[in-house]
């Protein structure tokens, strides 16, 4: 699958809000995003072809729930969260603090 990265080295490109939800990253067919009314603990939502997951970023990257993602998709989503964890957390603080 083609990968659409909106990240460049040390540069975050803020995408327009899609369906009222700030998108952080689109890659491997997965969209990583926040809802507008988020709450602690810090986490991201993942959408992959209408399948959904929620991944906590603190205290460490961990799965909160999964609704339909396959094991391989969950692994890729968790790995992506680990790679971009600091960027996602910084964006959380910019939006919700």
Segments predicted by a language model, with ranges:
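Conserved recognition-core residues within compact binding domains
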Residues: 14-16, 23, 50
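Short, charged/polar N-terminal "headpieces" of proteins
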Residues: 18-40
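Short, charged low-complexity linear motifs
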Residues: 21, 28-30, 69, 73-78
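A short, structured beta-strand/loop element
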Residues: 35-69
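C-terminal structural segments of small proteins and small subunits
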Residues: 71-97
């Amino acid at each position: 699958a083609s990968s659409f990265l909106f990240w460049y080295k040390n540069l975050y490109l803020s995408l327009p809000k899609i369906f009222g939800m700030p998108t952080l990253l689109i890659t491997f067919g997965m969209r990583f995003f926040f809802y507008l009314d988020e709450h602690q603990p810090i986490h991201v939502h993942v959408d992959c072809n209408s399948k959904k997951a929620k991944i906590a970023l603190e205290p460490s990257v961990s799965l909160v729930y999964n609704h339909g993602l396959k094991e391989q998709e969950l692994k890729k989503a968790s790995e992506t969260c680990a790679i971009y964890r600091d960027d996602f957390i910084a964006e959380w603080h910019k939006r919700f603090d």
